[in-house]
Design a protein with these regions (language model features):
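Short catalytic/metal-binding and nucleic-acid-binding patches
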Residues: 1-162
Length: 162
């Protein structure tokens, strides 16, 4: 039994991910493969940006259908999403509690993209951070907004482009 690796759980134990608030979510591609596109434009006026692949365009389109997203970026091998879950009865999603949770939104995104692509493009699990206050929110917003420009410094960066 000790020969098997222990799986690290990324969720905060005992936390209710249906609670109103903001959440920063990162989902990686399977094996961190560059499936979603590539960063281009370091030498042009508009600056670095992600040139999406066909799969990356599907990911971006699917994210755009989630009304609770404040900001997102599709990078070559991962996606960052800043979510805002409203209090019950508030906001654009007037549905039952399970559909108003971070895990439900991640499952929706992964399932929808997988079905559209006809193959698994995601790693198992995802990373999340519960946003704690306005300063944290603004720091995360800036991180997402400048992610393409800082791609080579990103913890998810790999040399493989394409």
């Amino acid at each position: 039994l000790d020969d098997f690796p222990t799986r690290k759980h990324n969720r905060l134990p005992g936390y209710d991910y249906t609670q109103p608030g903001c959440y920063f979510v990162t989902i990686c591609s399977k094996d961190r493969e560059h499936l979603f596109g590539r960063v281009v434009g370091a030498d042009v006026l508009i600056g670095p940006h992600v040139q999406l692949s066909e799969i990356g365009a599907i990911v971006k389109q699917t994210i755009s259908q989630i009304p609770l997203v404040d900001l997102s970026i599709v990078m070559p091998n991962h996606v960052h999403i800043l979510l805002r879950l409203p209090a019950a009865g508030d906001g654009p999603m007037e549905t039952s509690a399970p559909t108003r949770s971070v895990p439900w939104i991640v499952r929706y995104l992964k399932r929808t993209v997988t079905m559209a692509c006809g193959k698994t493009v995601w790693q198992r699990g995802y990373h999340d951070h519960i946003v704690r206050g306005e300063a944290d929110y603004l720091r995360i917003w800036n991180y997402i907004d400048t992610n393409p420009a800082k791609w080579r410094e990103d913890r998810y960066y790999t040399e493989t482009e394409g």
